[in-house]
Amino acid sequence: MISYLLDTHILLWWRTEFRQLSKAQARVLQELEDQGQPAGLSAISLREFAMMIHRRRISIDTPLDTWLDSIESNPLITILPLTPKIAAESGRLGDDFPRDPADQIIVATARCHGLTLITADEGIRKWNKIKLV
């Protein structure tokens, strides 16, 4: 059973820059890994990765499709699709929520699935209407 949803940058840090994680985030991710317990990842995060690579904000040493496939096939990651329920929830987050559509979908995904979101995003953290690590 999935209990946590990873924000896009958290997955990157988990795999490449572990020191960027807070102590609480690192502890939770290590526990998940030790227990073989998967974390959720919104499908929109795959697009965010593709755009980061396209804009050269991150670099990878394999073709993009192969890299994204490796995320999908990772037993510690469960990709959660965008559903009509999540789309509707993303529109209900309110005017005080950040305008980034990807962040809206990620938070709506966590809310619809009853998951705790692991994020360092300040806008989401300030909103403070969801369980966070």
Region annotations inferred by a language model:
Residues M1-L41, R55-S70, H113, G123, ...:
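Short, well-structured N-terminal submotif of metal-dependent ribonuclease cores
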Residues F49:
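Phosphate/NTP-binding elements of NTP-utilizing enzymes
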Residues W127-V133:
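Active-site regions of enzymes building and remodeling cell-envelope glycoconjugates
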